[in-house]
Amino acid sequence: SDPVIKHLPGLAGTAYDGVTVEQVATMTSGVKWNEDYTDPKSDVAQMLLVAPVPGELQSITYAKRLTREAPAGSKWVYKTLETNLLGDIV
């Protein structure tokens, strides 16, 4: 599978560097994420509030804040951001 940065070069140097498109599609990127809809400080809530950066996709802007919690391919965690990244690719 292609590296995700091949299709979204704005992710180079982020926690998504070294992650494949397949790992994003299977939500096994290893990127730390909080999908708690009841927590206003969760990633899923904060992602929607990120200030726009001219010429940059909102998903890329938010992804730049994230860190890795596990090696890519080793842990499944549902991440709304990753569905957005896949949409950005296609």
Which residue ranges define each predicted feature?
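Catalytic-site signature segments of enzymes, centered on catalytic residues
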Residues: 5, 36-90
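Active-site helix/loop module of the DD-peptidase/beta-lactamase fold
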Residues: 1-32, 36, 65
